[in-house]
């Protein structure tokens, strides 16, 4: 069960519920391995060739056995919009803003 108050998003796909969360270590990995800088260039996470990597990073905390193939299967089954919606609580908690601010494209914390 997901808890948005703890920065968790939930997504139903592949016959189960997936919990998405973005620990700092995963954000560091995204920047070093994929060049996705969530603090200074959040739009970089939407690149099609990187989006599955962002999803995988958010899955790893609750689902350490998740693989790149699982991330792609989830995207194939539900599409990007439900995944983006599920990512929002995790991304907002990581950035230290509310989901509403994130949706409005609010200022990034300094």
Language-model-detected regions and their locations in the chain:
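Short, isolated positions in well-ordered beta-strands
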Residues: 18-20
């Amino acid at each position: 069960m997901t808890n948005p108050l703890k920065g968790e998003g939930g997504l139903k796909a592949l016959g189960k519920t997936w919990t998405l969360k973005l620990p700092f270590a995963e954000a560091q990995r995204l920047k070093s391995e994929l060049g996705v800088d969530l603090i200074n260039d959040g739009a970089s996470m939407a690149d099609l060739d990187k989006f599955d990597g962002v999803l995988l990073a958010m899955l790893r905390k609750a689902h350490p056995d998740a693989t790149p193939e699982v991330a792609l299967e989830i995207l194939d089954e539900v599409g990007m919009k439900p995944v983006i919606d599920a990512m929002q609580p995790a991304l907002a908690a990581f950035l230290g803003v509310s989901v509403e601010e994130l949706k409005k494209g609010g200022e990034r914390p300094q």
